[in-house]
Amino acid sequence: MGFESGDPQILKNIKKGATVERARAFAKDCNDLGLVVHGDFILGLPGETKESIRNTINFAKTLDCETIQVSIAHAYPGTEFYDYAKSNGFITNERMEDGGGHQMAHIEYPGLPVDYVMEMVHRFYDEYYFRPKAAFRVIWKAVINRDVPRLYVEAKAFLKLRAQRNKMVKEARSARPDPTTPAKAGV
């Protein structure tokens, strides 16, 4: 389910046509019916702030989806988002991935550096999956359902990607002497 954001203003900005309350009710109904929900979230959408990212992480934890995916907003040429980001000078570069298929942030809003967005993707996963309820669910599946082979592969892939994201965040921080200084356009 594409929840995108847990911040009402961000949902309005992207013209989602849904509300936080409606999304929460949908997830609850699915859980009550025993349906598995995979939640998709995007950080760096138009108008994103540190507070709206925090709202989204907190919102995701209340939904208690079986699994989540956290993506980074990308402004593709020919889209309304691209025109908005380009005209406001928010595009720091045209590089949306690192060559290995990993997403890279390329939109920087005032007070929201690209390396912060990357770090928050990393934190989002940590805060979501390392909660007692989420950890218990994984252990329960491994022990009770004997789903060990699949979970082992998924856990190994998750931890590898987590290490890669952590490395990218550290490299981005070290490349910028003052983390409060915005990245230069075209870099």
Q: What are the functions of these language-model segments?
A:
Residues 1-66, 80-87:
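Conserved non-cysteine loop/helix-boundary elements of the Radical SAM core domain that shape
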Residues 73-75:
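AMP-binding (ANL) adenylation modules
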Residues 80, 90-187:
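Radical SAM enzyme core and accessory elements
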